[in-house]
Amino acid sequence: MRLIQNMCTITEYPPGTHTECASSSAGTASSRVIKIAVVGGSGVGKTALVVRFLTKRFIGDYERNAGNLYSRQVQIDGMNLAIQVQDTPGVQINDQNLDSNEQLNKSLRWADAVVIVFSITDCKSFDLISRLHQHARQLHPDNRIPIVIVANKADLLHLKQVEPQHGLQLANMLGCTFYEVSVSENYIDVYNAFQVLCKEISKQQNTGTPERRKNSLIPRPKSPNMQDLKRRFKQALSAKVRTATSV
């Protein structure tokens, strides 16, 4: 996977809307779009995972997200792809009825693939995986939507509540690929998780109907706008500076 254009914030969307970036230069070739939803419990590191993948940077403190949709141009096996990554608000552990979570449902229906994230330091977030997996499958009854399970915070061994083999066993049982990562310390593992999904979706789209292949094309983004992400970085850095000053 090769980056061919900088990450672009598409939108912080109102409920029910997904808008796209416009193209960075008129007349450029179209790119096939790949849509990935990142879901999981609160505080497991979904936003950090997305930002790490898109920018290779890690900042530990983020404001609670309202559901940001990001785009990045990449090249896989010589094909230009526009990856759209939907960062979703955390699912509450006590949310017994996922059907009523409108924002989650819209994100899952929109997606071509799903990343389910849990934290090895939070066994309750691990308990959500099966429910989220089943829910995603129910929303795509006629399509074998690719799903990757990511165990985050692998560096926090002293706080570990979930053993790696438990995550791997569950992923195997559900028929999913499994990655244990430390978003804060290892970019490569994060990259690999998304690369696997991109290749699998691209393969599915290549074997789809002509109409499906036609619908998967969108214009390349133009006028990249990173203001939203830069604002988050500045807020996080400012908070750290204030904390250090007050000590």
From Swiss-Prot:
Keywords, in A-Z order: GTP-binding, Hydrolase, Nucleotide-binding
Aminoacyl-tRNA synthetase among keywords: no
Region annotation Small GTPase-like: where it falls in the sequence: 29-247
GO biological process, one term: mesendoderm development
Domain of life: Eukaryota
Listed SMART domains: RAB, RAS, RHO
Stretches for region Disordered: 205-228
Name of the featured protein: Ras-like protein family member 11B
Organism: Xenopus tropicalis (Western clawed frog)
Organism ancestry: Eukaryota, Metazoa, Chordata, Craniata, Vertebrata
